[in-house]
Design a protein with these regions (language model features):
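Membrane-anchoring hydrophobic helices of lipid-metabolizing enzymes
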Residues: 1-114, 149, 156-158
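Soluble catalytic domains of membrane acyltransferases
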Residues: 81-200
Length: 200
């Protein structure tokens, strides 16, 4: 239980800092992580060289940038309690929100398929805080404390959350029946029963 309270305390402190400072700290953490996480760094570099045909230089530059941005993303996630309807518009921009409203207006519910790019947690937060009736499916973490903490952040900005491996199918069906927006992030291995699809 101490881990939960540690995460809550960190989030409380971070969410009371100026946003620009939060990002700067995150970028610094990302640079530090890139240096110390040698095993993960090498594995990531080898993967994109093999799968995407990157050169050594391209792979190193890409993974370094990724690690740095992940640091900022971590800090932004911890900052989520500070997000509200007033400040989210200055932090997240939607190109065509009218398209989503139009789709919801058809009264059939909307399935929104996204991927783990940029800050996917803020995407859900921005949708919910902008008034979209968002239900989302989350993949439980090996340590349930992380899942509980993350779901608390998600619910705090107005999302309805279903966990994979429970009764999420029923939850998704109910969300669609209520004409809600169902958010799915489906760019991960589906496991033993997963289906591989072409990518890039």
């Amino acid at each position: 239980m101490w881990l939960y309270y540690l995460l809550k305390s960190m989030s409380w402190i971070i969410s009371h800092l100026p946003y620009k400072l939060v990002v700067k700290i995150g970028l610094g953490l990302g640079r530090l992580y890139y240096i110390i996480a040698k095993k993960q760094r090498i594995r990531a570099e080898e993967t994109i060289k093999e799968r995407l045909g990157y050169s050594d230089e391209q792979a190193k530059a890409t993974i370094r940038s990724l690690f740095i941005k992940l640091g900022a993303t971590f800090m932004e996630i911890m900052y989520m309690p500070a997000l509200n309807k007033n400040n989210i518009r200055g932090l997240v921009t939607f190109d065509r929100p009218d398209v989503l409203w139009e789709a919801l207006g058809e009264g059939k519910g909307v399935v929104m398929l996204a991927c783990h790019m940029d800050n996917w947690e803020w995407l859900g937060a921005a949708l919910a805080l902008s008034g979209f009736p968002l239900s989302a499916v989350e993949k439980p973490q090996p340590n349930h404390i992380y899942s509980d903490f993350m779901n608390e952040l998600r619910k705090g900005v107005g999302q309805e959350i279903f966990s994979r491996g429970t009764s999420e199918i029923l939850g998704c069906a109910r969300a669609m029946k209520k004409k809600r927006m169902l958010g799915l992030i489906a760019d991960q291995d589906g496991g033993y029963d997963g289906i591989f699809v072409p990518f890039l």
